[in-house]
């Protein structure tokens, strides 16, 4: 299991939400897709082409440790710890800001932008920097070519 990223209380504060329940396990990652959710992940119920709120109960069935949902979400049987916010995307952005603020002042962040070649460039940077600083380089597992890729 991964080391816990958040306590439930810190998650609620960072998201600017209201707690509904308590998280029964360490919160170790994030997911916006129940197909890739791992036990302990925090599920974020985003609305896009589909409404993530339709998948909250499924996320808990797959082991989600908590979910960030709209304040208007109606709790279902089987739901676990909820963080109720006005807008789940804004809540996720708050969590991202809080996570970034936890970085050491010595940490460096590299952003790769553009219309072609981002994934290859990211992977090349990760490989090169990992040689210089083994175990100290972090990169997204995949590209998130959307508005929540780097909230």
Where are these regions (language model features)?
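Phosphate-binding loop of NTP-binding sites
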Residues: 91-151
């Amino acid at each position: 299991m991964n080391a816990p990223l958040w306590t439930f209380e810190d998650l609620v504060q960072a998201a600017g939400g209201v707690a509904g329940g308590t998280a029964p396990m360490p919160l170790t990652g994030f997911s916006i897709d129940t197909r890739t959710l791992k036990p302990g992940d925090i599920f974020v119920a985003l609305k896009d082409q589909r409404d993530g709120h339709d998948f909250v109960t499924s996320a808990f069935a797959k082991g989600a440790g908590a979910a960030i949902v709209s304040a208007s979400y109606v709790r279902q049987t089987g739901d676990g710890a909820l963080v109720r916010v006005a807008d789940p995307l804004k809540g996720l952005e708050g969590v991202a800001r809080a996570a970034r603020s936890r970085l050491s002042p010595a940490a460096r962040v590299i952003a790769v932008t553009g219309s072609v070649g981002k994934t290859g460039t990211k992977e090349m940077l990760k490989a090169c920097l990992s040689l210089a600083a083994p175990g100290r380089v972090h990169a997204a597992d995949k590209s998130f070519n959307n508005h929540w890729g780097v909230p």
